[in-house]
């Protein structure tokens, strides 16, 4: 089970400060997780400028120009935000037994180490 999943609220914990034009301290939702590259794409963080070639679409319109898109950031540079204190926290796992229809099942649950709340 992964520490950070799509849809989690994370905070950038390394990099240049916001006063110098960086992203450290910014919070955003995880848009996608690139597991094989150990990277995540965070909403509103790590913008890059892309030059897109003008090309034909199927409907005949031409698209292209300069776009700004979110680039992946390494997973070690972000921390999950505690739902209670809204500050970065580490993630822990604990096993819980859940009974459903008379059958007990063991499930791994993620929790915030600062507050102990389930994620």
Curated annotation (Swiss-Prot):
Gene3D superfamilies: 2.30.30.30. One of its GO terms (cellular component) is ribosome. Transmembrane segments: none annotated. Keywords: Ribonucleoprotein, Ribosomal protein, RNA-binding, rRNA-binding. Belongs to the universal ribosomal protein uL24 family. GO terms for biological process: translation. CDD domains: KOW_RPL26. One of two assembly initiator proteins, it binds directly to the 5'-end of the 23S rRNA, where it nucleates assembly of the 50S subunit. One of the proteins that surrounds the polypeptide exit tunnel on the outside of the subunit. This is Large ribosomal subunit protein uL24. It holds the Pfam family ribosomal_L24. InterPro entries: Rib_uL2_dom2, Ribosomal_uL24, Ribosomal_uL24_KOW, Translation_prot_SH3-like_sf. Part of the 50S ribosomal subunit. One of its GO terms (molecular function) is rRNA binding. It comes from Clavibacter sepedonicus.
């Amino acid at each position: 089970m992964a520490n950070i999943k799509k849809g989690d609220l994370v905070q950038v914990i390394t990099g240049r400060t916001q006063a110098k034009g960086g992203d450290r301290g910014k919070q955003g939702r995880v848009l996608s997780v690139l597991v094989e590259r150990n990277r995540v794409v965070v909403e509103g963080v790590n913008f890059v400028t892309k030059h897109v070639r003008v090309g034909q679409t199927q409907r005949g319109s031409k698209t292209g120009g300069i776009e700004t898109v979110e680039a992946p950031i390494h997973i070690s540079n972000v921390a999950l935000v505690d739902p209670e204190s809204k500050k970065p926290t580490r993630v822990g796992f604990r096993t819980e037994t859940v009974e459903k229809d008379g059958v007990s099942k063991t499930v791994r649950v993620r929790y915030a180490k600062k507050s102990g709340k389930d994620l």
